[in-house]
Amino acid sequence: MLTSDGAVFETAGGRAVTLRPANEDDYEDLVRVYASTRAAELAQVTWWDDAQKLDFCRSQYDAQKLEYDARYPGAEYDVILLEGRTAGRIWVGRDEEEIRLLDIALLPEAQRQGVGAALVGALIDEARSSGKRLRHMVFILNEGARLFYERLGFRVFGEFSGYFQMEWKPESDDEAVGC
């Protein structure tokens, strides 16, 4: 199970990835992670200065967190550490039927190092062992992310508000025997 209990996940390159619960002291780092996900978009906004862009990212991060808190009570909000340094965030909700990867975001310097694959792989292992589906939403224009999840066995099953709804499901008995 993907938890922030001190478990160490290893990237394919052998780098140590750990999680810890996010707390108030992480706010600015988490806003920085959020801002990194909007950097290309905000680079096109020439009428705001850097302080205005940061204020926008704070307000958007706060709104996103409030939305997830309301829709997924009990969700886990963790800071991703790569060899002990803040590298990103992962938010996961669980219920009786599914595991939902609400959000995963990595700072640019932590991307393409196997961190996301290690963490999503741990969620897939949890889904497999619990017999639950694992769901995630990917922005329709983010082809790289969609392809990443498809390589891990996710399939698009719908669209909602500009996002692909993606799902990884444990193999059913019928699929396992080729029926």
PLM regions and their residue ranges:
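Acetyl-CoA-dependent GNAT
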Residues: L2-G13, P21-D25, R32-L102, L107-P108, ...
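Helix-turn-helix-type domain boundary/helix-start signal
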Residues: R20-P21, Q113
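Conserved active-site tyrosine of GNAT-family acetyltransferases
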Residues: Y68, Y149, F154
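A short, internal acetyl-CoA/4′-phosphopantetheine-binding micro-motif in the GNAT/acyltransferase core
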Residues: I104-R112, V138-F139
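Conserved GNAT acetyl-CoA-binding A-motif
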Residues: R128-F139
